[in-house]
Regions:
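Single conserved hydrophobic/aromatic residue that forms the stacking wall/gate
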Residues: 1-11
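SAM-dependent methyltransferase catalytic-core segment centered on the flexible catalytic loop
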Residues: 10-48
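Flexible loop/turn segments at secondary-structure boundaries
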Residues: 12-18, 62-65, 92-95, 146
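Short secondary-structure boundary/capping segments
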Residues: 21-24, 69-73, 100-102
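A general structural signal for short secondary-structure junctions and capping/turn motifs
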Residues: 26, 46, 75-77, 126-131
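Rossmann-like AdoMet/SAM-dependent catalytic core
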Residues: 80-232
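Long, charge-rich, low-complexity alpha-helical segments
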Residues: 139, 219-283
Length: 283
């Protein structure tokens, strides 16, 4: 695809973190550490058509000096490419080495296993690796002139399958959200996605719930914490009233500051639309 542009690119790169001396070419990407994944994240966007998506599985290193598990990933993506990473699992160097040595049946002979294990750990130590993240890396062509999206989630629970439509819908929602200011966003009407339920956790004897959250039954099966105000807002999202109208009603009912609530609700609504909890009525 060097000189081509695509609407969809799917990849599962050979991303085991091996040293140059390793003989397992079927799983070795030919780059030290996570360099192959870095090159793909940096360059795949150049091969995507407008609204094009690249989907791949990959591993990445988390170094001791990193501020978060996705610090290095953030630095890889160019400004014209949206990057969404879903971390499904995280392993220490010891856990990672043990996994791949068992995959190669290197644990059958103790002396060789110790040598190979030490080689893995020395290689990780040379780059001050504290963990290895594993999961999905999703890239999307950022519309011209728009700010790119950076989304990083750690979701280790079981996800619904297939996810293709949910991924497409999420990037479409990002494009839709980028076109609207907070004020314009709250002039829209919304409906709650069909797989979303509302949960209330109450301590026996207490009048009010101690926790409230929205839960997705499908796609990525996320949860989203709710305040009293947000729960009130979502409960009225039936596609009839605009977000602005709902907020005005909540302000009157709870005697709140309207400007402050508009700002807080707009931030939450952006996240709820991006994650698929709320759907703009026209979509």
């Amino acid at each position: 695809i060097r000189r081509q542009r695509q609407m969809c690119i799917r990849d599962s790169p050979r991303t085991e973190h091996e040293s140059a001396a390793d003989q397992y070419t079927y799983r070795d990407g030919g780059r030290p550490g996570d360099r192959l994944v870095e090159e793909l994240v940096r360059n795949l966007g150049a091969h995507l058509n407008p609204r094009g998506i690249a989907v791949m599985l990959g591993n990445w290193e988390v170094h001791e000096a990193d501020d978060s598990w996705h610090s290095r990933l953030e630095s890889w993506a160019p400004d014209d490419t949206d990057l969404w990473v879903v971390q499904r699992e995280q392993a220490t160097p010891i856990e990672y080495a043990d996994m791949w040595l068992k995959d190669a049946a290197e644990n059958r002979e103790l002396r060789n296993w110790r040598q190979q294990f030490a080689r893995y750990l020395d290689d990780f130590a040379a780059r001050t690796v504290s963990h290895i993240g594993m999961g999905m890396l999703l890239l999307h062509a950022t519309p011209e002139g728009a700010s790119s999206v950076r989304r990083f989630e750690s979701l280790e629970h079981q996800l619904a399958q297939p996810l293709g439509a949910a991924i497409r819908d999420a990037f479409d929602a990002d494009d839709w959200l980028r076109e609207r200011s907070d004020a314009e966003l709250l002039e829209e009407t919304f409906v709650v996605a069909g797989d979303v339920t509302d949960e209330r956790w109450t301590i026996p004897g207490e009048e009010h719930p101690s926790a409230m959250l929205l839960r997705q039954g499908g796609s990525f099966r996320r949860t989203f914490p709710e305040s009293t105000e947000l729960a009130s807002f979502v409960s009225v999202c039936d596609g009839e009233l605009t977000g602005q109208q709902i907020v005005v009603a909540i302000v009157a009912l709870l005697e709140l500051d309207q400007d402050a609530l508009l700002g807080a609700i707009a931030r939450d609504v952006r996240d709820l639309v991006a994650y698929g909890f709320l759907i703009p009525r026209w979509m």
